[in-house]
Amino acid sequence: MTIQAHKRTLSEVSTSSVGQLKRREGYTEDYTDEGSDIDMPEYVTDSANNQQWQDTISRVVQSVVSVHFAQVAPFDCESALVSEATGFVVDAKLGIILTNRHVVGAGPFSGYAVFDNHEECDVIPIYRDPVHDFGFLKFDPSTIKYMNVQALELKPALAKVGSEIRVVGNDAGEKLSILAGFISRVDRNAPDYGELTYNDFNTEYIQAAAAASGGSSGSPVVNIDGYAVALQAGGSTEASTDFFLPLDRILRALRCIQGSQPITRGTIQTQWLLKPYDECRRMGLSPESEAKAREQFPGKIGLLVAETILREGPADKSIKEGDILISINGQMICSFIQVDAILDENVGKPITLVVQRSGIDITVECTVGDLHAITPSRYVEVCGATFNELSYQMARYYAIPVRAVFLSSATGSFCFDTKEKLGWIVDEVNNQPTPTLDTFIEVMSTIPDCSRVTVQYHHLVDQHSPHVTTVYIDRHWCNEFRIFERNDETGIWDYKNLADPIPALPLKPQTAKFIDLPISNPKLARLARMLVMVSTIGPVPLDSVDPEPRKAAGLVLDAKQGYVIVSRRIVPHDCMDVFVTIAESVLVPASVVFLHPTQNYVIVKYDPAQVQAAVETPILSTERLKRGDKVQFVGYTHNFRSVSSETTVTDISSLSIPSNMVPRYRATNLEAISIESSVGSRCHSGILADDDGTVRALWLSFLGEKQDEKDKIYLMGLDLVDIGEVVEVLKKGKIPRVNIVDSGFGSISVLQARLRGVPEEWIKRMESESENRLQFITVTRVSYTDEEQKLVSGDIILSVNDQLVKQMRDLEGIVTTTDVPAVQQVLRFKIVRKGSIMDLDIKTIEVEETSKIVIFAGCILQAPHHAVRQAMLNIPSGVYCTFRGQSSPAIQYGISSTNFITHVNEIETPDLDRFLEVVRTIPDNTYCKIRLVTFDNVPFAISLKTNYHYFPTSELSRNSDTGRWIEHLCNATPAKN
């Protein structure tokens, strides 16, 4: 059975009342008035019962609130998220709301509560239980002005089998839902929600069939008299079974808070399970002990049996799995509530337990530990990842000591696995053991920026498989090294900075030796000296490209100057670290020199002085490939092993890659090469060469659309003749600039051209001059422009500057250099539009790469990048949301990726500079009104509350002189050092 812990699925629930079910089934029951022997009709009793329930519910809803919350950072086993749940007031004077622990969360929390009359108030967490699924939020009662807030009274003793109950909450995220049911069990073990997530244990749970779903977590379970008898906690996704937490220990915690007393929580680091007597007998329970227990507890079904005892815990080597708990401190035990009561009152004190092992009573003495002490209350941010001490939650599930550094967010430098982000334990960093968080902090504070250090780690699921890898220490993009600590007085996790970044160590030249390719032809074998590996690490999802590590082979264009060409899928923009690996031996940093706007290649530059190796400059072909040409394919597989094969060019045609739903870079307007050999489908990078070693084409990976949350990759070749002008500019020591006609083009057959109005003389001219393929080029889409003369979709291109357009290459960009002033080129187009020939003067543009972003409320804002302009006919604003972070106010209040922000507090924000000016004036923890436009040009407005403590406003921009990206904080709360 699949168990649903957090109850967040949005499924509609329709539950008939029990009375209605009885009537449908023809069920009748006799009711007699006291002192009377007259049977009352069923409808009379149902009517009275329903009226009492209506009166009760009308009172209860005054106490129930909808909790809108964000767990703002990944912590322990809980990911960052935004959600809704339920809570209810348990102390109206102090302003205390009871809800679930998985709502309050173990980590940082931000949220607000909405009462039944739609009054809103901020809430802060004041307590979350280390084990049991309950926590308390606090609000200011004086902020609720239009209703009399009522507290529900907790009556745990009224939860009995057969009791009729109502679950009053926000089921499936609705404002108010009332679900009916009957309590069927009061002695089931806590549900198991699976590994690597929060689980309650060492408590009884109450079971009922109420079919509650997402949003009902934290709902009060009330009886007909309006008393809260349990707390909604979880349920099954495959049945209408719900699990309620008993209120006994919750009531004790509430009284401690009301009396300003600490909520002590004791533990001997042992998990018990309630097992029925028949199982206990099989485990060795003696007949005498069973008889005594049944006599002492006539209504109980079994005893507690030890399930897990943690190593190095108070009960280690004293209690063993399968031991049956008989008594503690002379008090016979039959329930978890008794155990909790004794442990909580004896923290730091010795206790005496009697357990039965194979029919023999064994007396054990343990010192009760502090449960709060083994519950993490701080975490560290460094290198883009977050760490905390291993929690009792995780240690208990995997039966390991509560002592380790737990990687709660495997991102940034510590992204060990792109698929598995949770469950990693860091054992060593830089060959130094890290058994505790404090030791980890000491080790990390000594490592310079840009270092590569060895890390040993393992996963909780597989304790037997240690892993060793080398990680890149990023303290420049992710320069924060700080520790957050929970403050239960304010509800905020205060942070302090731990250490400033240590500057990177100077590079030293290193030697490397190439191993030639295993090819009999020596000229082809030497191609290995012209191929290097290019890898990238990106800190932010700029231009809507996921910030994941990428790697592929690149071709050296100029060994003396250190120029390398590689697929733009590997280097989508320049806001990242780029590295070149030479001969699988030497790793050196590189910088982005040139990004082609349409042809899917990037040129990067490394410092040749840092490498002492026989890197060679290839001979690049000046003759285009044709269909049927024989070439040698040299490529690299997914595990970066070189392969080679003789192959044939099978096709050269215009490229057509589908656009992604969220616009991002894709190659357009180029002639792509296909080959016969299947080896090309296994290689994401490589080259095509002649037998004399002349390089004819690049084999590149092209980023396509997302399918099932995975990027689709296309593999094709790019003729090196197409990049000849750019290479010549680079060899002269200059930086190229490309002006393009910013439209999308495709090809159509001669038949289609004739049917769409192309005159016969142009068709004859095409037939006489075309050498490779008979086709016409047509406009498939037009980028956003405010020019009067512009191309439109469906135009057929006849000529440009009186030159016949026979293929996509005839529309290539105009290459100039950056050392001369930019001049907007104008091209004379002759086209066929709706059957008529037209002449147009079309201006070319230089595509501007993104050079500035603003991070506000957890979303990344930038000017609309080229892919957005390619996809839209109208740009509503110069402030475009390209990404939004988990648990951010942007998600909580409704800013989506691909939205444009047009106004903030009714002030127009046409660009990022104006937007920054406006948001700088917005105070922390206040609402602002934001007007937006969707990608489909649908305007809407939201209100958003700022949270600068966890989501500061910052600006990241590229310095035009140095090319370095620099961050400036705009709105943030100070550290408490």
Swiss-Prot record:
Question: What keywords sit in the KW lines?
Answer: Apoptosis, Hydrolase, Nucleus, Protease, Repeat, Serine protease
Q: Where is this region: Disordered?
A: 1-36
Q: Which GO terms describe its cellular component?
A: nucleus
- Name a biological process GO annotation: apoptotic process
Give the residues annotated as active site: 102 (charge relay system), 133 (charge relay system), 216 (charge relay system)
Residue ranges spanning the membrane: these are none
Per the UniProt entry, the Enzyme Commission number(s) are 3.4.21.-
| A molecular-function term among this protein's GO annotations | serine-type endopeptidase activity
- Tell me any Pfam family this protein matches: PDZ
Tell me where in or outside the cell this protein is found.
Nucleus
Q: Where is this region: Serine protease?
A: 64-254
Tell me which InterPro entries the record gives: PDZ (IPR001478), PDZ-like_dom (IPR025926), PDZ_sf (IPR036034), Peptidase_S1_PA (IPR009003), Peptidase_S1C (IPR001940)
Where the record annotates domain PDZ, the positions are: 271-356, 749-835
Q: Does the keyword Acyltransferase apply?
A: no
Extent of the signal sequence:
none
EC class of this enzyme? hydrolase
Q: Which domain of life is it from?
A: Eukaryota
Q: Does the keyword Nucleus apply?
A: yes
> According to its UniProt record, which protein family does this protein belong to?
Belongs to the peptidase S1C family.
Summary of the function given for this chain in its UniProt record: Nuclear serine protease which mediates apoptosis.
**Alphabetized PANTHER family for the sequence:** PRO-APOPTOTIC SERINE PROTEASE NMA111 (PTHR46366:SF8)
Q: What is this protein called?
A: Pro-apoptotic serine protease NMA111
